[in-house]
Amino acid sequence: MPLPKIEDARKLNDEELVEEILAAKRQLFTLRFQKATNRLEKTHEFKHTRHRLAQLMTVERERQLQAQSAPSVTPEEE
């Protein structure tokens, strides 16, 4: 299974992005639990999940910075 592409994360809207981040965090928790109980079979899933989480959080941060840098127009300035 190839690593997910960041373009896929950029296509998500804000709500879907938050849901995906939470899902990735839950998946990491599950993987850690399986590792602790010696039930983990696919160790490569750690890498894939961490990679996906990093991509999602990067996209989220890009959007935050973009929103901050966008000039806000107040009714007084119009």
Swiss-Prot record:
GO molecular function: structural constituent of ribosome
Domain of life from the UniProt record: Bacteria
Pfam family, one: Ribosomal_L29
An example Gene Ontology biological process: translation
PROSITE patterns, A to Z: RIBOSOMAL_L29 (PS00579)
Keyword line: Ribonucleoprotein, Ribosomal protein
Gene3D superfamilies from the UniProt entry: 1.10.287.310
Any one GO cellular component localisation term in the record: cytosolic large ribosomal subunit
Family: Belongs to the universal ribosomal protein uL29 family.
PANTHER family, per database record: 60S RIBOSOMAL PROTEIN L35/50S RIBOSOMAL PROTEIN L29, LARGE RIBOSOMAL SUBUNIT PROTEIN UL29C
UniProt xrefs under HAMAP family: Ribosomal_uL29
Protein name: Large ribosomal subunit protein uL29
